[in-house]
Regions:
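ABC family nucleotide-binding domain
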Residues: 4-177
């Protein structure tokens, strides 16, 4: 296997009951690749990327990440998710937390960073996307594009090796493109 290979997908299948979402899907994704999955609604695009982050378990086939079989029994899913970040279609921000808390919670709980270090990192990233003034706002006070940028910042704060986006153009702010 090439040392630059991040994902190797072999003969992947996903079924929901009698509905086959995809079957025989094989692909190799290398470090530095930008991959876009295009297809009709209901075609399995979201399901596929959810399989890459193990939010969905494939029905059959194998997924290797950095040479390790992530579909194997006993695989450490939490360790994998620290390396493979995801920005969800609905952004999945915690409505009861401020923007700053949405970003820092995983840094303090998962990465065990101090509150101060987490806050500093979050504010730096918020500044990069032009939302430092929204640090104390709640998700309901934000536009769709702002929520999307917060979700991206939250994912980037974890410093993943790979970042998966579900419907990345769904809430683009024209002024940010």
């Amino acid at each position: 296997m090439n040392g630059n290979v991040l994902f190797e997908i072999k003969d992947l299948q996903k079924k929901f009951g009698s509905l086959t979402v995809f079957d025989g899907l094989s692909e190799t994704i290398c470090k530095g690749d930008v991959v876009v999955i295009i297809g009709p609604s209901g075609g399995g695009k979201s399901t596929f990327i959810r399989c890459l982050n193990l939010l969905e378990q494939p029905t059959a086939g194998k997924i290797y990440f950095e040479g390790e079989d992530i579909t194997a029994k006993g695989f450490d899913v939490n360790r994998h998710r620290q390396k493979v970040g995801m920005v969800f279609q609905q952004f999945n921000l915690f409505n009861n937390l401020t923007v700053l808390e949405n970003i820092t919670i995983s840094l303090t709980k998962v990465k065990k960073q101090s509150e101060e270090e987490s806050k500093e990192k979050a504010l730096k990233l918020l500044k990069r996307v032009g939302l430092e003034d929204k640090a104390n706002a709640y998700p309901f006070q934000l536009s769709g594009g702002q929520k999307q940028r917060i979700a991206i910042v939250r994912a980037l704060a974890m410093e993943p090796d790979v970042l998966l986006f579900d419907e990345p153009t769904s809430a683009l702010d024209p002024e940010m493109v």
